[in-house]
Amino acid sequence: MYGITGNGYRLVSSYSPKGDQPKAIEQLVEGVQRGDRWQTLLGVTGSGKTFTISNLIAQVGKPVLVMSHNKTLAAQLYGELRQFFPDNAVEYFISYYDFYQPEAYLPALDKYIAKDLRINDEIERLRLKATSSLLSGRRDVIVVSSVSCIYGLGSPEEWKAQIIELRPGMEKDRDQFLQELVSLHYVRDDMKPGPGKFRVRGDIIDLVPAHEELAVRVEFFGPEIESLQTFDMQSGEVLGRDDYAFIYPARQFVAGEEQMRHAMLAIENELAGRLNELRGENRLIEARRLEERTRYDLEMMKELGYCSGIENYSRHLAGREPGDRPHCLLDYFPEDYLVVVDESHVTLPQIRGMYGGDRSRKTILVEHGFRLPSALDNRPLRFDEYVGLVPQVVCVSATPGDLELEYSGGVIVEQLVRPTGLLDPPVEVRPVKGQIDDLLGEIRKHTARGFKALIMTLTKRMSEDLDDYFRKTGIRSRYLHSEIKSLERMQILRELRTGEIDVLVGVNLLREGLDLPEVSLVAILDADKEGFLRNTRSLMQIAGRAARNSEGFVVLYADVLTRSIREVLDETSRRRKIQQAYNEEHGIVPQSIIKSVEQVLNTTGVADAEERYRRKRFGLEPKPERLLSTLIDTLTAEECYSMAESLRLEMQEAALKMEYEKAAYLRDEITKFEHRANEAGKGI
């Protein structure tokens, strides 16, 4: 068992650094300790980049923000880091919306689209837990986040000022404490309290902090707190007595009474000025619309201390000047934290693009009287603001982009040697003429040895036609592109991994996360058509899909040796020489990563569940309700959420077709899956 203890972190792993990992870890640690603001880790597919970063975190001892460009990869990183750091605060911060339709207005159609959303309570709890851990003073905090971390949050100073500290023996009036809970947006629920709720039984107040699952019991004796206990709200079992407790706000946007009063006054003043401006331009409809909406929001803020869309008034609530950047998750970190940007060639451009899209949509809302101009300041960070905020950054990618190379000064830390000894697959360029027949021969050669193939085409139509041709020639093939629903994509991937099909044809197979050990052949048709999916980085990324197999081989069909192809050939040759030399020096024989069918089914079980569920639902098997109940009990929380999402789309389609009975039936099924998901999630 390998481990590192010290600097507040405890890293635990069943394996130790191998290959290029020790050298990469040493160089990254030296860079952080030297004060380098930007570093780039170039790690080939399968080289163990996450383990390298975990060693870096353990050795430098700083709070860490790990950024990923989508929720799925963020969840994977969160799971891996929790395993590496079981005793430390590994937190998860992504958008808490299961569904989100932003507020928008389409002037050409004179159509207003109201904000529509559905919040995932568990993710909201995890977000609050992340901010709570950061403000608790702990140094051993790792937050895994999507780009949600650059969007507006409440002020950390105000949020921290609202925290309630409780200790046995301290003087505190019971009624005053209840008022404080309500001001922090806790809700009284004497029947079924959960996170962010409390119940009152005489001098005993039970509450579940918004970021926790266990409850706190506060017992009063006269004007003071007699005792604090932690207990399980479901079973009632007391788990222990506490010497103190901190109650954090139940929402990200909180404001004290005085701050709220100043904010409402500022909103009134801005509204008056904007109404004069609109009326002066004879835009009476816009003026009336803005006045009605804003006054309604002000009334809600006055009565409840909150309103729907309160984030649009965040500039006034925080007392910021026009144009000032909003507070975000980065402000909750101490000054010396470390940022790790995973898949930086995608994540950094995504960060850079967030501001423009958000401002374009909100400018239209402001122009047509749906929002005050201050709503423009409820926005994600601009890229220059992001760069100015982050103290030290480590970019991680198999194909670093221009941005990270520029900020790193062109200096990169390479991790080219895999612990498994696998080499980058050889790349061969072949002429376009006769490419299909040649490809057919290669496919048969590889599938005869029990391996699989990935084929990249230029268009969706080409992928469908090629798949049809392969089927006619006896090749077990499927096509995969953006028009195929997510659950069906998962089922297709499962079929590839379990041996039901041998070939996958698609346009952009990069986004599928196809790190499949069974794939030994990657073929790219029309590789000389320069563009987004035929540039150097895309070609290197797709070639890496064959890097987990010792028989990996890449074919580029091209008549012209473009700059991108030359760079791929040169870089692959360079890497193979380094990897081969290391293997010879250490006597390593490359071996493919092999997974059992059981492991494959575990990772793609949601597709299997979808198939079984549909059979039961359409009466292909007896007693569907009994069997459905049995099926649901076998699913994980993630699988249940995926099933619920699939059914929700069908429910919406049924409602649009006025098939209300079917929609109601689907609604009930969704409720079952969501209930099971919540139960399964508690067992994680």
Curated annotation (Swiss-Prot):
It is found in: Cytoplasm. CDD domains: DEXHc_UvrB (cd17916), SF2_C_UvrB (cd18790). Keywords: ATP-binding, Cytoplasm, DNA damage, DNA excision, DNA repair, Excision nuclease, Helicase, Hydrolase, Nucleotide-binding, SOS response. Its main location: cytoplasm. ATP binds at G43, V44, T45, G46, S47, G48, K49, T50. SMART domains: DEXDc, HELICc. The keyword Cytoplasm applies. The keyword Glycoprotein does not apply. Residues 641-676 form the UVR domain. A motif (Beta-hairpin) lies at residues 96-119. It comes from the Bacteria. Residues 435-601 form the Helicase C-terminal domain. The UvrABC repair system catalyzes the recognition and processing of DNA lesions. A damage recognition complex composed of 2 UvrA and 2 UvrB subunits scans DNA for abnormalities. Upon binding of the UvrA(2)B(2) complex to a putative damaged site, the DNA wraps around one UvrB monomer. DNA wrap is dependent on ATP binding by UvrB and probably causes local melting of the DNA helix, facilitating insertion of UvrB beta-hairpin between the DNA strands. Then UvrB probes one DNA strand for the presence of a lesion. The beta-hairpin motif is involved in DNA binding. Forms a heterotetramer with UvrA during the search for lesions. Interacts with UvrC in an incision complex. Belongs to the UvrB family. This is UvrABC system protein B.
